[in-house]
Amino acid sequence: WLSEQIASLAAGAAINRYPDADPRSLKDIIRTVIDLPRDLDILLGNGSDEIIQLLALATAKQNAVLLSVEPSFVMYKMVAAFTGMQYVGVPLANDFTLDVPALLAAIEQQQPALMFLSYPNNPSGNLFDAQAMARIIEAAPGLVVVDEAYYNFAGSSFLPMIKRHPNLLVMRTFSKLGMAGLRLGFLAGSKTWLGQLEKLRLPYNISVLTQLVAKQLLRSHDVLQSQAEQIKRDRVMVYERLEAIDGVQPYPSAANFILFRVRYAGKIFQGLKERGVLIKDLSRAHPLLSDCLRVTIGTPQENECFVQALQESVRQCV
């Protein structure tokens, strides 16, 4: 029934008109869904990628540093290059947890204008220790953006911490809730910061169709969240199935995917592909990801096909 409602909205959309340049009604629905206090504000972006670029543009003075951890979301490094910022990546520990001493030392030495921390982290899927995150936010001289793209699969958020840390902003996207094609993300934070960032936001960056469809979907947020809850249950099942395969080491995940390490990852990836299953080969993306592959949780049928194909591929490579 949601598909029918969306089709009806699209059919009646005034696409001959410019979109609302500051869609307050959409912001209000988002504010209600995330229970954001009135003294904080929201900035909308054409996906979180646009917001990452906007933040970099706002802080990209000469020799300004953008700092993040590695491995993490590749867009942080890419946007630093696009905007002329110096990128500094601090490696995570071998178990993908934060290396707090190394991060604090990098902050002290580099004095970053902008920091990104993915929570849960992409591609490892784990939630960093909240107390360690707080120490890093307090030590940072510039803006710290907590990227909560996978919040709906984790349930843990830094939104309540914004008032405690004046340099903290929280970013989310609706892509992981089945709205990737709409390209809609948002940044939450103090009105002071967002008021300045709004000056750099391009007008009409959220299309007429995106505004209409997003509002309709967010009015049915309970349906979307129930889908996320199902993915969380399926994630447990897939993790347990992976644990049971000799030679496969899955990593605990709070996202909608699972990272796992397996010998001959390249051959396993090809074996899966030959069996009609396409996942992400991260084995050459970063030294810490050696022999790592990442699978997104799908439908129960897709998950079963993946597990069976993986079992066959592992047996073939032994």
What are these regions, as identified by a protein language model?
Residues I231-K232, V236, L242-R275:
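Conserved PLP-binding catalytic core of the aspartate aminotransferase-like
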Residues N167-A244, Q249-P250:
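PLP-dependent aminotransferase class I/II
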Residues N16, A58-L117:
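PLP-dependent aminotransferase-like
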Residues E274-R275, R284-V318:
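PLP-dependent enzyme catalytic core of the Aspartate aminotransferase-like
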Residues E70, G89-N94, E148, R172, ...:
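Short beta->alpha connector loops at strand-helix junctions that form conserved
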Residues W1-D49, L54:
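N-terminal small-domain helix-loop-helix segment of the aminotransferase-like
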Residues N94-E148, N152:
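Active-site phosphate-binding strand-loop segment of PLP-dependent enzymes
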